[in-house]
Amino acid sequence: MTVQLGAFYLFPLFMAGFVQTNSNLEKMDCYKDVTGTIYDYDAFTLNGNEHIQFKQYAGKHVLFVNVATYCGLTAQYPELNTLQEELKPFGLVVLGFPCNQFGKQEPGENSEILLGLKYVRPGGGYVPNFQLFEKGDVNGEKEQKVFTFLKHSCPHPSELIGSIGYISWEPIRVHDIRWNFEKFLVGPDGVPVMRWVHETPISTVKSDILAYLKQFKTE
Amino acid sequence: MTVQLGAFYLFPLFMAGFVQTNSNLEKMDCYKDVTGTIYDYDAFTLNGNEHIQFKQYAGKHVLFVNVATYCGLTAQYPELNTLQEELKPFGLVVLGFPCNQFGKQEPGENSEILLGLKYVRPGGGYVPNFQLFEKGDVNGEKEQKVFTFLKHSCPHPSELIGSIGYISWEPIRVHDIRWNFEKFLVGPDGVPVMRWVHETPISTVKSDILAYLKQFKTE
Amino acid sequence: MTVQLGAFYLFPLFMAGFVQTNSNLEKMDCYKDVTGTIYDYDAFTLNGNEHIQFKQYAGKHVLFVNVATYCGLTAQYPELNTLQEELKPFGLVVLGFPCNQFGKQEPGENSEILLGLKYVRPGGGYVPNFQLFEKGDVNGEKEQKVFTFLKHSCPHPSELIGSIGYISWEPIRVHDIRWNFEKFLVGPDGVPVMRWVHETPISTVKSDILAYLKQFKTE
Amino acid sequence: MTVQLGAFYLFPLFMAGFVQTNSNLEKMDCYKDVTGTIYDYDAFTLNGNEHIQFKQYAGKHVLFVNVATYCGLTAQYPELNTLQEELKPFGLVVLGFPCNQFGKQEPGENSEILLGLKYVRPGGGYVPNFQLFEKGDVNGEKEQKVFTFLKHSCPHPSELIGSIGYISWEPIRVHDIRWNFEKFLVGPDGVPVMRWVHETPISTVKSDILAYLKQFKTE
């Protein structure tokens, strides 16, 4: 099932000034020879009620984000809401994965995470408009399998991996996620397309996605 | 100025079944030859507005507690409210010191801590009825001076200090605080009287304080 | 079986100028209520050929030392030789336990340790004139049982335990050995008598032992 | 000054059975667009007497190796002697850099390293027939500049970087050297040509160098 994008939807957004095209240094195109798709993997929703097979997102453009409540980048959460809203018509689905491996900035239980987002940080009643999954590892021995697949389908994000004081997983690998709020875009066929470092502004992520959608449209 | 305790106030509480006397192993009587008092020290209130000199608590029985929002013992917070309420008439003042050194379970900024307590953990609208101070260290090179004084005025709480994965201070010392929610009782003369390990139930802390107040009264 | 000490042997040594009596701060008298003896424990000799039951030292005054080749204190090795030689007539037996837990300064295999001492540090053909045992842990989960017994039979040596960069055992305990070359003296009944911090000069250890032997003699 | 290689010297070695060509997975060809050469860097010899500018090796094929005495791979030392001897006629110069960053397996002082090699490991009177330099870092904030240049001139050697227990440098980077005995071959123009992981047998390193020399000869 492929997503039909009306070019005329894309163009206004592309030009609407929401989009600052940063250098591609931050965007990494994933490898061309990836075998397998995200459809081989699954996860429990944050409230533990639903076991979601990622193949349910076949045909969608899925943005995987490892998130945390008490991070200096937690302000990206509301921006992800905006991104989800704006690009939903184009088949974008944002998925959030709380993780406590980066400076232990997601200390809450699954049942506490939405409360923390709503009342503490970003606070002000914030509620994600995209699916969050159960807290889990994205690096190291107990990393969630979908993140093993995503990480090794794309170039590593930076020469710097981190400092021992903030690394709480074993072993340390080149393709490890560097910090909260790294992002992977997966195409409608379940194959990873792009990866962004955590500091990449959402606006850049958005413009990269729009450019990709446009190109996807013409192809 | 010494606190006049009506023995008849103490006795009912002592017997009222709220009190389970645990073995004294958990309570440690501080050293008799302590020099100096807490009145030499000070701290900023959690909101940063007030610089409090601890000598303002002269004549009070002050309970110092290092606290954290996302700790397995955070349920002690409401119990500390009850303790403060019940023993306020006897001159007890509870003081809370948020600290992120134990498993990094206090990741929030000062401005976020009360929100986390109110809405996330313990949540349910909880508001401490005692003073909280600015987040700070209680162990290691940058430990708050009052905690240096408190720790070295009393025996260390346990043979086990901890595991490297959860110790995020330097250097490691015998008298270091072991985890969130350790407690020190300071007498009305500013001299430390008792120290409890973090796991000590508040009910035991209460009965120890009542026994101490009773003895203090008769002396 | 008690060691008969000729007082006249002790006195000249005591006065011979080899002995500088340092403050007792460095010496710690072990606890009086110790149960058990070193005779419950054993170890393999460095070359692995012999399994030594410590009860074979019944009647002797045994000095346990955790040693390392590449330590700033390795110069104590030749001084331990001198100590063994001088106090052998009085029943002193020095036992060395190579250990790699302090800054990883004993990296060699058992078969390499004597070579390292002889040719590298202290070098110059040095050969210990006392028994060395197989390399093993003295702190943490896999610590040798005799060191668990020794450590908990005596006060801990210092408030400072160490810095995380140099601590490679789990968990961290108050009575842990602080560095290479700590020493425990055990009486002829197998019960620990004294403990010294690593920096204590051997001359001080010697004078403390002589004073103890003298007292032991009169008692 | 370029090295004239008599093809007839290369061919017999290439075929002489000393050479097992392993998969190139272990060999990494350095980047083509490297700017700068090793000639911009220098180091002090192990005994501290000589300050060597690497430009003195212009025209030579230089093999940089970070070494350690108490490593499971220290047996590569005698093999490096053989390599130096066999390929000296073809302009190969082996340079060894003792480093204590991998499991702290080079604890000795500069003055002790040759003693350790000669009498302990590999022992048996072993003396390197190639230049050793002063002990120093090859990763992290204080890494020697020549290793910064070498590491970033070639692909990183493996996805696995290591486990926190054995990493004693900050920060951790993708191109960091993984363990003792990694190797870099630098051409006669001072530009890095090849990099090998630490486990690569010296025989493979040799056959890779011979193949390179042969190709270098024909070009």
From Swiss-Prot, chains A, B, C, D:
- Signal peptide positions (record): 1-21
Which InterPro entries does the UniProt record give?
A: Glutathione_peroxidase, GPX_AS, GPX_CS, Thioredoxin-like_sf
One of its Pfam families is GSHPx
Q: In which tissues is it expressed?
A: Proximal caput epididymis.
Tell me where on the tree of life, at the top rank, the source sits: Eukaryota
Coarsely, its chief localization is secreted
PANTHER family recorded:
EPIDIDYMAL SECRETORY GLUTATHIONE PEROXIDASE (PTHR11592:SF127), GLUTATHIONE PEROXIDASE (PTHR11592)
What does this gene product do?
May constitute a glutathione peroxidase-like protective system against peroxide damage in sperm membrane lipids. Since the purified porcine enzyme has very little activity towards hydrogen peroxide or organic hydroperoxides the protective effect is not likely to be exerted by its enzymatic activity. Instead, may protect sperm from premature acrosome reaction in the epididymis by binding to lipid peroxides, which might otherwise interact with phospholipase A2 and induce the acrosome reaction.
Protein name from the UniProt record: Epididymal secretory glutathione peroxidase
